[in-house]
């Protein structure tokens, strides 16, 4: 399995090689096509160019055991991915999120990279702890790097009032709020 490319980017593609007994190949292909239709329908508005395909490999891939495959899938399903919490103070602002940005299974080694962002430090730590616990319970070694402090926006700051007024004078309309969050990276092996 090879999905995503960078820990600070939403994955855009993934490939996976699986071993299937010849007697089950027709059923696996049919189920793949069924799931592909479901996924494409679910994401048609936000990812209209999603492409999912199945093809036969030129050679037999090196495989991991079924039990390890199930452990990996179950653990990935437990790891927060996407919006974790919206801001209770600023409408429409994502307060915290996590991106499972990279998953790689190669040479019998499982590696993931994820990135947590939050304007609230304790919430970022909560997401990081949840991810750590999920992967450590599977027996993985978890390394946390690239921690940046959370920064909670102050919608009532003096500079914001001045900048809003200046924007209104220049453009004769109200500005739209924009905020950035800070990051914590995870690598799991």
What is the role of each PLM region?
Residues 27-30, 34-41, 74, 78, ...:
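Charged/polar, solvent-exposed surface patches and flexible loops
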Residues 97, 101-178:
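Substrate-recognition/cap regions that form aromatic- and gly/pro-loop-enriched pockets
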Residues 181-188:
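Conserved small/polar residues in nucleotide/adenosyl-binding loops
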């Amino acid at each position: 399995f090879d999905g995503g490319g960078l820990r600070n980017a939403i994955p855009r593609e993934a490939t996976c090689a699986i071993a299937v007994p010849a007697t089950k190949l027709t059923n696996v292909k049919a189920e793949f096509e069924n799931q592909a239709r479901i996924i494409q329908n679910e994401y048609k508005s936000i990812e209209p160019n999603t492409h999912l395909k199945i093809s036969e490999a030129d050679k037999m891939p090196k495989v991991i055991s079924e039990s390890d495959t199930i452990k990996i899938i179950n653990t990935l399903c437990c790891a927060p991915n996407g919006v974790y919490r919206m801001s209770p103070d600023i409408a429409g602002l994502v307060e915290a999120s996590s991106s499972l940005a990279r998953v790689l299974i190669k040479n019998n080694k499982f590696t993931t990279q994820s990135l947590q962002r939050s304007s609230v430090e304790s919430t970022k730590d909560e997401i990081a702890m949840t991810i750590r616990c999920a992967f450590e319970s599977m027996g993985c070694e978890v390394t946390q790097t690239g921690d940046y402090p959370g920064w909670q926006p102050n919608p009532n700051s003096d500079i914001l009032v001045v900048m809003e007024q200046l924007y209104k004078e220049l453009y004769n309309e109200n500005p739209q709020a924009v905020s950035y969050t800070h990051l914590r990276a995870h690598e799991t092996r």
